[in-house]
C-alpha cells in the first residue's frame, strides 16, 4: 500500500455535511485494510480566486495509506459528489502524522482567544 495526501474542498452551503462525507471516505479507505494517518478539518476559508462563483469553501486534509483500488474509488466518489468543488491527491513517500502548518496556526489562534477571554 502507498501513502497519499488528499485535500478536498466542499461547497460552503454543504459544510454541515462534511463529517458524514469524511466518515464515508474514511470507510472507503479502511474497508480493505487501509489507514487514515491524519485527518484535519480546516473549516471554511477564503479561496484565492472564485470557483463556480464561490469565494469560500470548506477544506479537509487526509493523509491515508491505501491501495490503488481504494484510491480510484475515492477519486470517483469525489467526482460524483456535487458538493466537492475541487480535490487533489498527492503521492507521499511515507506517512505524515504531525499537524500541518495551517492546523498549528489555528491552534495558536485558539490559544490566544482563550487567554484573552480569561483576562
Swiss-Prot record:
Keywords: Ribonucleoprotein, Ribosomal protein, RNA-binding, rRNA-binding. GO terms for cellular component: cytosolic small ribosomal subunit. GO terms for biological process: translation. Disulfide bonds: none annotated. Coiled coil: none annotated. Residues 95-119 are annotated as: Disordered. GO terms for molecular function: small ribosomal subunit rRNA binding; structural constituent of ribosome. Belongs to the bacterial ribosomal protein bS6 family. Binds together with bS18 to 16S ribosomal RNA. This is Small ribosomal subunit protein bS6. It comes from Halorhodospira halophila (strain DSM 244 / SL1). The gene is rpsF.
Amino acid at each position: 500500500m502507498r501513502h497519499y495526501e488528499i485535500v478536498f474542498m466542499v461547497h460552503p452551503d454543504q459544510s454541515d455535511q462534511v463529517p458524514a462525507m469524511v466518515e464515508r471516505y474514511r470507510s472507503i479507505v479502511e474497508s480493505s485494510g487501509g489507514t487514515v494517518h491524519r485527518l484535519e478539518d480546516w473549516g471554511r476559508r477564503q479561496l484565492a480566486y472564485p470557483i463556480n462563483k464561490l469565494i469560500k469553501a470548506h477544506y479537509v486534509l487526509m493523509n491515508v495509506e491505501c491501495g490503488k483500488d481504494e484510491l480510484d474509488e475515492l477519486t470517483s466518489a469525489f467526482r460524483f459528489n456535487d458538493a466537492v468543488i475541487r480535490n487533489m491527491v498527492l503521492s507521499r513517500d511515507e506517512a505524515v502524522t504531525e499537524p500541518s502548518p495551517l492546523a498549528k496556526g489555528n491552534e495558536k489562534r485558539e490559544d490566544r482567544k482563550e487567554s484573552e477571554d480569561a483576562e
